[in-house]
Amino acid sequence: AYFDDPETNEFLQSIGSRIAVEAQDGGQTFTFFGVRDKSINAFALPGGFIGMNTGLITRTSNESELAGVMAHEIGHVVQRHIARAYVAQRGSSLTALAGLLGAVLIGAVTGSADAGMGVMAISQGAAMQQQINFTRMEEHEADRVGIGYLSAAGFDPDGMAGFFSTMGRLQGPS
C-alpha cells in the first residue's frame, strides 16, 4: 500500500531528484514514493515511478545507502529494462513453444512419451536460463550506471555496496 506520509515522500523525492538529474535521460521525470511493506525491496515502474518499501528505508544506515538503491532503480528505468524484459520474455516464450512442438514431434516419431517429455524439459530449462541470464545482465547494468549517477550526485558511492552487503547479511547464506 502507498505510504501516505508527505514528509517521507518529500525526503525520497529530494534524494531521488538529485540522482535523476545526473541520469539526464532526455527529460524523463521520476517520481519516488514510499510503500508500506516491511520487506526490503524497491522497484521501478514504467514512466519513471520508483517505489521504496518502508522495510528497505528503515534498514538503510545512512543517506548514501538509500541513494544507492535509488540510483540502481533509476538505472533500470534509464536502461529501459522493463521494455527489454518484455521483449526477452517473448523470446523465451518462442523457445518454450519450439520445445513444445519439438516434444510433440519427437514423441510422435519415436512413439515414446518419455522422449517427448525429455525434449520439453530441456526446452523449458533453456527458456528459464535465458530469463536468468537476462536478469543478471540487467542487475549488473543497473549497478554500473547507478554508481555513476550516485557519485555524480555527490553521494558516497560506497553506499550502494554497503547496503547490498547489509542485504546479504539479512538474507543469510543461500
Predicted segments, located by residue:
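Peri-catalytic and regulatory segments of divalent metal-dependent proteins
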Residues: 1-109, 127-134, 141-174
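A structural motif
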Residues: 106-126
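Active-site-adjacent, His/Asp/Glu-enriched structural segments that form or flank metal-binding
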Residues: 120-122, 138-141
